Amino acid sequence: HCISSAASDVYKRQSLARILTKALNCRNLIEGEPCNDCDSCSEINAGSSIDFQEIDAASRRGISETKELLETIPYLPTSSKYKVYLIDEVHMLTKESFNSLLKTLEEPPPHVIFMFATTEFEQIPPTILSRCLQLNLNSVTVEGLVEQLSKIFSKEKIKFEKSALDL
């Protein structure tokens, strides 16, 4: 339930998160691709989805902000299958923030997906990284990314159409 990606380009990190979120939550996949028309896709495209939260850890890195996020975890998604939390620049979180995330990462609710984006994997505690699939977007090919995501979704028993992952 956690994907960690590294890329120097913020656009790559955020685009990947949006594409995956739409692929996971689209109600009307068209030949395996998000329709970009259903409520879920439209809300993600407009940046107004309650079920897709983007957090900038560079400015919201403290324990109080992390606890605030964790308080929302038990609530089911409002209009999507999954609630997705994108924490960009995750390596900026404090030690206390990482520790508070650990229990949720160890026992994630079935309706929650975390996406951690960073420029520096080495700054993330090993206890956190060991619970995430790690994708280095600086050197990954599209085919390699699709293959890795297919493995993860299969392992996590997340239903998907492989063609939805073909970027």
Annotated model-derived regions:
Residues 12, 35-41:
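Short cysteine clusters
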Residues 32-34, 142-143:
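Short coil-to-helix "N-cap" segments within the ABC nucleotide-binding domain's helical subdomain
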Residues 18, 52-54, 134:
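Conserved beta-strand scaffold positions in the cores of enzyme catalytic domains, especially
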Residues 5, 56-167:
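Non-catalytic interfacial helical region
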Residues 1-14:
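Single conserved hydrophobic/aromatic residue that forms the stacking wall/gate
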Residues 41-47, 127-128:
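Short, conserved catalytic or adaptor-binding loops enriched in Gly and charged residues
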Residues 21-33, 44-47:
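Post-Walker A helix-loop "phosphate-sensing" segment adjacent to the P-loop in P-loop NTPases
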